[in-house]
Amino acid sequence: SNTGPFGDAFAPPYDDPYVVTSGSTTGSSESLADVQPPNDQAAEKAVLGAMLLSKDLPPLMHQIVRAEDFYTPAHGRIYDAIIKLSSNEEPADAVTVADQLEKDGELERIGGRPYLHTLIESVPSPASGPYYAQIVAEKALLRRLIDAGMRITSYGYAATEGMEVEEMVNRCLLYTSDAADEG
């Protein structure tokens, strides 16, 4: 049963499978500090690889996923370079993206030219790129919700006598609304 951080007095009246307390939702003994935020590295690599293989995909992917949706910062940088080239109607393949990243001073930070070829090799099918992009976007939304939850929790703990509870509630609602709207 879920007793919550303050014992049984504040526990929900039911077991919520989505509440993570001392472990993960799978019942392992990991603490929340040990749990990696939601992400899917295979999907991130497949999105980028698909974009490198198909000149038609970058505009479509840009409607589904943004650079900040990638958990791995290097993947966001690569995505930005692909979108930059594509929006200028230039080819966005491993060679041109590497050149763009080099101009931007980012090539070594993303793992160099060989990493771009690794991305291409990781794509099961470029046609599935939009599906992988949706996975990346959903994982990013989950991370934003976690961030909103952490902010809400900190408001609850930081409440002072002078702070209006209604104002705190409105801020908390704004955080969750913003997290959902960005998704």
Task: Annotate the PLM regions.
Residues 149-160:
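Secondary-structure edge/capping motif, primarily at the C-terminal ends of alpha-helices
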Residues 175-180:
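Conserved small/polar residues in nucleotide/adenosyl-binding loops
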Residues 149, 169-174:
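Short amphipathic alpha-helical coiled-coil/interface segments
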Residues 20-21, 168-170:
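N-terminal non-cleavable signal-anchor helices
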Residues 183:
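Extended, polar beta-sheet/loop recognition surfaces of beta-rich domains
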Residues 1-141:
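Noncatalytic partner-interaction/assembly domains of nucleic-acid and motor enzyme complexes
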